[in-house]
Design a protein with these regions (language model features):
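Surface "functional belts" at beta-alpha junctions
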Residues: 22, 34, 89-182, 212, ...
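Phosphate-handling active-site elements
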Residues: 48-55, 84-93, 109
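Acyltransferase
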Residues: 134, 177-226
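N-terminal beta-alpha supersecondary unit
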Residues: 1-64, 183
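Gly/Ser/Thr-rich beta-alpha loop segments that engage phosphate groups in nucleotides
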Residues: 12, 34, 65-69, 73, ...
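DPxDG-like acidic metal-binding loop motif
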Residues: 59-90, 95
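Glycine-rich phosphate-binding loop signature in dinucleotide/nucleotide-binding domains
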Residues: 50-55, 105-107, 149-151, 197
Length: 226
């Protein structure tokens, strides 16, 4: 199956095209890139390089968050537009699931990717590696409350660790500080999307929305003013 993976949930964005589990084309952008301007041109560039036509794609997989409001909104809109235009199926992939792939070679039993959600909170989800399943829902939570939920020796990583390192240091956790582990990979988005699709999971184009977990700052200010 030929899959286009789109990942723009953070400051670093990337697009990948996979043929089965093989990455055949990829574009990555550094901090400060413009999601809106780069995403379409990068897809076109990849197709030119690998000499594929857009219609060769069998499935469009998009990372839906949590993460950057702007990045997620643009990625989802782009995925829906491509799905409509090409008549191809689209599948949503939660970003925290994608991040877990960054530590798939680690032997830790319990894993928790942590994304900085600002305003003294983080996005997180706890996974049981042995049972290959989530222990919790996708969370927006304070670091203090998250640490109370984590079993000792849990492997934690992601850009939500550094801002609250003193809090996470209060417990015997396995902390990986490599910044690269906090960057979701579009190739993993494509692979996970393919797995979900082959498992029979479907996503209607009209129902595809970002996984924000909380309202934007503007929405919260509006509610507070009422």
């Amino acid at each position: 199956m030929k899959v286009l993976g789109i990942e723009t949930s953070g400051l670093v964005g990337n697009i990948a095209v996979c043929d089965g589990n093989t990455v055949v084309g990829k574009k990555t952008y550094g901090k400060g890139f413009s999601h809106g301007k780069e995403i379409v041109s990068s897809i076109e560039s990849i197709f030119d390089e690998i000499r594929w036509e857009p219609n060769d794609i069998d499935l469009i997989a998009v990372s839906i968050g949590p993460g950057s409001y702007t990045g997620l909104r643009i990625a989802v809109t782009c995925a829906k537009t491509l799905a409509y235009g090409l008549g191809k199926p689209v599948i949503d992939v939660p970003t925290l699931d994608v991040l877990v792939e960054n530590v798939k070679d680690n032997n830790a039993k319990t894993i928790c990717p942590v994304i900085d959600a600002k305003r003294k909170s983080v996005y997180a989800c706890i996974y049981d590696r042995d049972k290959n399943r989530k222990i919790t829902d996708y969370l927006i939570i304070s670091p203090d409350n998250l640490i109370d939920m984590l079993p000792e020796t849990t492997l934690i990583f992601g850009d939500g660790i550094a801002p609250y390192k003193q809090i996470f240091a209060q417990k015997e956790l396995t902390i990986l500080s490599d910044e690269k582990l906090g960057i979701a990979d579009a190739a993993d988005v494509a692979r996970l999307g393919m797995e979900r699709y082959e498992q029979g999971i479907r996503c209607e184009i009209n129902s595809l929305i970002p996984l924000y977990l909380r309202k934007s700052e503007a929405e919260e200010r509006l509610m507070e003013s009422r």
